[in-house]
Amino acid sequence: MKFVIAPDSFKESLTALEVATAIETGFKRVFPDADYVKLPMADGGEGTVQSLVDATQGKLIECEVTAPLGDKVKSFFGLSGDGKTAIIEMAAASGLHLVPPEKRNPLLTTSYGTGELIKLALDLGVESFILGIGGSATNDGGVGMLQALGMQCLDSQDKPIGFGGAELANIVKIDVQQLDPRLQQVHIEVACDVNNPLCGECGASAIFGPQKGATPEMVKQLDAALSHFAEIAERDCGKQIRDQAGAGAAGGMGGGLLLLPSVQLKAGIQIVLDRLHLIDYVKDADVVITGEGRIDAQSIMGKTPIGVARTAKQFNKPVIAIAGCLREDYDVVFDHGIDAVFPIIHQLGDLSDILKQGEQNLISTAQNVARVLAFKFH
């Protein structure tokens, strides 16, 4: 008997590794002699660093970088077990949660700290990057990040522009001569699950600006600034980023990253599936178990359980999902490779208590799932 356990984290309760371990514990009460493969998963969003560090026996690197409003903030990134890959979450340096609601203003916020994380990882000699760009506070086209890496965005006085989305309107020249040369030797995979272009009614400013504090007038100003940046970038860097799918992700960070030498925008879950070689483990599995904190109709939009299920179904393997909770529309996942879904909440209660009981409830639910499977396998 072989079980592959490949869940995402249960947010605010358990990491993906803790979820996988709890499921294994429950199953071992019924199948003590089975073979178990635990693969902590993620979809490129929050928790991706921790999951990939755990899955590769890597480590977290703590550091201090520039926060969205220019002050300093404690941050981190992950290093894979072999030391060759850095895993970075943009939100750890340039995240919306780092800016108090009353101070959120994408005219002013910068992605400079994300560039500093990349540079710190380069100092460790990494060969590749996985970069998650969700949850950002910025709308600066990734220019702050590029500045931290040595790219010069100069104004009419031949001086570097300042921080923030508004400053992009002042760019008259982009000089790549001082861009960190080590970037020529590394490949960057960007976890990007949106297809928005850089500018226009479906662009970064219009779609994502308001949630970062932009008023309707700010949206117009930011969009014009990004459009101007794209024009200068095409002239000075020879790359057309305005209409590229995904360029509008994370306030234009997708577009800014495309100006670097070797960058690929890719679905977050696919990056993780490929890096952890899930397909190699499910080929000879008897059952695949996945899960996440909540399963609903949104789960089919690039979330971990469906990514795992689709991989398993290439080999016609049964897939069971265990979730913290379910919404009424959860059954849509049955059309996307998941065969059964089990919630772990056993009784109503205060949310904080339910979160505290998450591990024990997960073990108990996993044991019950295993007991059902025992009818087939024993």
Curated annotation (Swiss-Prot):
This is Glycerate kinase. It comes from Haemophilus influenzae (strain ATCC 51907 / DSM 11121 / KW20 / Rd). Pfam families: Gly_kinase (PF02595). GO terms for biological process: organic acid phosphorylation. Gene3D superfamilies: Glycerate kinase, domain 1, Glycerate kinase, domain 2. Transmembrane segments: none annotated. It comes from the Bacteria. The gene is glxK. Belongs to the glycerate kinase type-1 family. PANTHER family: GLYCERATE KINASE.
